[in-house]
Amino acid sequence: MTPATPSGQASTVPAGRAAIRVRKLTKAFGHQAALRGVDLEVAEGEFLTLFGPNGAGKTTLIRIIASLARPSSGTVHICGQDLSKEATAVRRQIGLISHNPLLYGDLTADENLHFFARLYDLPDAAARIDAILEQVGLTSRRRDPVRTYSRGMVQRLTIARAVLHDPAIMLLDEPYTGLDLQAADMLRGVLQELAASNRTVILTTHNLEQGLEMCNRAAILNRGRIGWQGQRSEVDLDSMKEVYRDVTGRP
């Protein structure tokens, strides 16, 4: 198969309103540039996988979209809302799974989820929390402090927190990192549900096989720039490996 979009060109976003629109985004840490003029659009209901090696800027981009970091310049719009002006409203539309679990270690799973339920002013929070803890397999540990959890259990609770408020947009930053087999299988099931739903998803990873499994569009971020974008239907694993090597210089 031939990749759809040559390196450096913008891919056509499917018809429909852009759920995420990033324009000329830059981010520097001192004299070190993490993002160098990123342009990216993700349509409503689209599942985009963002590939890139370590240090490419994936986490920085996700943190900015999630309103956890500010760009040096450029703009981000979420469902038409300017992130710089309406960050609180935007956060209610986003669920985030990242390296930082955003959980309180001294609180129990119950207490963590009830805390976030209050932040989102969720109706019927108790019933919602019961159902989600059952779904992620943590009902029997719901009253134990999170600091006593294994890495896989923490990630399962992170997933529960991320989907608690039924967000329209899910951001998953290298979600498979450090997971045990049970947690990885559960996460794969969550991703399958997201792919079948009407949610907008960005998944970041450097694992080509995992990243291509459920997306309908892919992009490669390298050294702070989008080097390639294309439709999933127009690439297979072998051609994606070739494109990735051409863009990043890495296998």
Where in this protein do the model-derived segments appear?
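Catalytic Walker B motif of ABC-type/P-loop ATPase nucleotide-binding domains
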Residues: M170-D173
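The feature captures the beta-strand-to-loop junction immediately N-terminal to the Walker
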Residues: F51-P53
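Conserved ABC ATPase "signature" region
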Residues: H114, R118-R141
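Helix-to-loop junction immediately C-terminal to a conserved catalytic motif
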Residues: A66
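Conserved ABC transporter NBD signature motif
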Residues: G74-D82, V90, W228-G230
